[in-house]
From Swiss-Prot:
Organism: Azoarcus sp. (strain BH72)
Record flagged with keyword Cytoplasm: yes
Domain of life: Bacteria
One MF term in the entry's GO annotations: 4 iron, 4 sulfur cluster binding
Swiss-Prot/TrEMBL catalytic activity: N(6)-dimethylallyladenosine(37) in tRNA + (sulfur carrier)-SH + AH2 + 2 S-adenosyl-L-methionine = 2-methylsulfanyl-N(6)-dimethylallyladenosine(37) in tRNA + (sulfur carrier)-H + 5'-deoxyadenosine + L-methionine + A + S-adenosyl-L-homocysteine + 2 H(+)
Domain Radical SAM core: 142-380
This protein's name: tRNA-2-methylthio-N(6)-dimethylallyladenosine synthase
Pfam name, any one: UPF0004
Every TRAM domain range: 379-446
Family annotation (PANTHER family): CDK5 REGULATORY SUBUNIT-ASSOCIATED PROTEIN 1, MITOCHONDRIAL TRNA METHYLTHIOTRANSFERASE CDK5RAP1
Length: 449
């Protein structure tokens, strides 16, 4: 059997897309995945262009597999994802040994691209945007474990000044309601108990309640439908946009117990001046109002966020406003980075007088504060009973299992060997016994039937 190696960079959307690449090639080519690139017949890099370092790392890693092409002339090397969309033919010009280049919307064409490469002897590039065609062409999802990602929409229409996503993944396109629910129902039949709904702006999803009937459902309606699917016990979603947080979505946190008490809500900055320069479309006051409404509906809601430090023109005063917002909201997790100019975005043309060492110092302060708040939340959970979904063997010890709480905390706990395998994929109750810097420890209380 032929083997497929995939290296994934970037977001959870890319993780999902990589699984779909494996599904497409598994169904069409009979190829199985491997963790060893040296034994692979197909090597794919699913790329991210959000930050410059991630982009350059792709070409670095391509160079590391170049020699395999000489050892195995029939080896197929492909580059997909957002760097592929952004660079296109330039990838082949820079790395002529690359056989196929494809975008996020054309990954379903991989078998045809590989066949064309073999037939013609020329590298194949397809970075077009055929809207939702990708999902129509996908084979049924194959999953292992009780948790799965489901992409419900593609692209972004917000055009924040720092972001390449609208240019690399296209504008927002929602999958039809029936298709999303059918995929999730199929996953539930395979034993999946937890789904994470994915999209660049996942809460911007819109879909017809009945196809061709003209009546439109919003993201809150979709959540209600997912909650009714037998076997699905826990629902997450990412990444959301503050501008798409509606009253109906706030109400969903009251109506839908299966919706977790954790939300990733990117704010990017605590300065109105910087938010306006980023073209985020909300003020700090409006963001705090959203947080108040969310916590009125779900008081124990855990919030994480995205932060960009050192945006062009940011001052010490702007940064201190971000730190103040972090304290006021109580964020307990973040993806935070120093601003990286992306070619083709409006912000790339702005003057950027802030020294790099200042930006790095700001980032260190911000991350330290977030870590402190995360530890405080974890410490507050010690002694409490928590419902977790057991995901598998702990990385800490083969004698232990690990799972996640409703608010997305990793819990490691000892499990007796006769029952260890049977607990994987099940919900159980654990008592939290201690809080470590990046995880919790617990002990089993009960197992759900």
């Amino acid at each position: 059997m032929k083997k497929l190696y995939i290296r994934t960079f970037g977001c959870q959307m890319n993780e999902y897309d990589s699984e779909k690449m494996a599904d497409v090639l598994g169904a069409g080519e009979g190829i199985a995945k491997t963790d060893n690139p040296e034994e692979a017949d197909v090597i794919l890099f699913n790329t991210c262009s959000v930050r410059e370092k991630a982009q350059e790392k792709v070409f670095h890693d391509l160079g590391r597999v170049k020699h395999l092409k000489q050892l195995k002339p029939d080896l197929i090397i492909g580059v997909g994802g957002c760097v592929a969309s952004q660079e296109g033919d330039a990838i082949v010009a820079r790395a002529p040994y690359v056989d196929v280049v494809f975008g996020p919307q054309t990954l379903h064409r991989l078998p045809a691209l590989i066949a064309a490469r073999k037939q013609s002897g020329r590298s194949q590039v397809d970075i077009s945007f055929p809207e939702i065609e990708k999902f129509d062409a996908m084979p049924p999802a194959r999953v292992e474990g009780a948790s799965a990602f489901v992409s419900i929409m593609e692209g972004c229409s917000k055009y924040c000044t720092f972001c390449v996503v609208p240019y690399t993944r296209g504008e927002e396109i929602s999958r039809p309601l029936e298709d999303v629910l059918a995929e999730i129902a199929g996953l539930a039949e395979q034993g999946v108990k937890e789904v994470t709904l994915l999209g660049q702006n996942v809460n911007a999803w819109r879909g017809e309640i009945v196809r061709d009937a003209g009546e439109e459902g919003d993201f809150a309606f979709l959540l209600e439908c997912v909650a009714e699917i037998p076997g699905i016990e826990r629902i997450r979603y990412t990444t959301s946009h503050p501008r798409e947080m509606t009253q109906r979505l706030f109400d969903a946190y009251v109506k839908i117990p299966k919706l977790v008490s954790q939300l990733h809500l990117p704010v990017q900055s605590g300065s109105d001046r910087i938010l306006a320069a980023m073209k985020r479309g909300y003020s700090v006051l409006e963001f705090k109002s959203i947080v108040r409404k969310l916590r009125a509906a779900r008081p124990d809601l855990s919030l994480s966020s995205d932060f960009i430090v050192g945006f062009p023109g940011e001052t010490e005063e702007d940064f201190e406003k971000t730190m103040k917002l972090i304290d006021e909201v109580g964020f307990d997790g973040s993806f935070s980075f120093v601003y990286s100019a992306r070619p083709g975005t409006p912000a790339a043309d702005l003057e950027d007088p802030v020294p790099q060492e200042t930006k790095l110092a700001w980032l260190a302060r911000l991350q330290k504060r977030i870590d402190e708040q995360a530890q405080a939340v974890s410490q507050s959970m010690v002694g409490s009973a928590q419902r977790i979904l057991v995901e598998g063997v702990s990385r800490k010890s083969a004698e232990e299992l690990m799972g996640r709480t409703d608010n997305n905390r990793v819990v490691n706990f000892p499990a007796p060997s006769p029952h260890r395998d049977r607990l994987v994929g099940q919900f159980i109750e654990v008592r939290i016994t201690s809080a470590l810097p990046h995880s919790l420890r617990g002990e089993i209380l009960t197992r759900e039937s």
